[in-house]
């Protein structure tokens, strides 16, 4: 990803078990719920979220600092709360981008066309998206995801 800009994704921590061929320190840092809670108590996370009971996801400060010290520009794929926390921590050193669908109706169409979720799950995801859309003004820039290719072009033009 982004050799000319030296972009690299952050590696998140999670308390869920590895799936398939996932490796610790590559796709995620895999922690037990107890280890995750201890690191929260120690202030080691830039941001974190308990998505379900004992199912945490978060970004470790030390990992991001290691990437920054290596000269990488770190890209985070986080929810709106995480994005706001990271921006608050790094201030002007961070560029926050909110990626949104062209409309809620288009998002619903995309979710339905996948054929992977029940109508109830889609309704829950739409409700979550509507909530998250209220955070868009807090971000430095907003990119509309018309298609994967156009979203990439928008990112490249920043």
What are these regions (language model features)?
Residues 45-46, 110-117:
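Conserved AAA+ ATPase "sensor/coupling" helix adjacent to the nucleotide-binding pocket
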Residues 76-78, 90-111:
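Conserved phosphate-donor/acceptor-positioning beta-strand/loop module used by diverse small-molecule
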Residues 1-5:
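A conserved segment at the C-terminal end of the G1
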Residues 14-74, 80-84:
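ATP-dependent small-molecule kinase phosphotransfer cores
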Residues 19-21, 84-86, 104-110:
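Switch/connector loops and helix/strand junctions flanking conserved nucleotide-binding motifs
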Residues 66-69, 88-92, 134-136:
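Conserved catalytic network of the ASCE P-loop NTPase/AAA+ motor domain
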Residues 147-154:
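Conserved small/polar residues in nucleotide/adenosyl-binding loops
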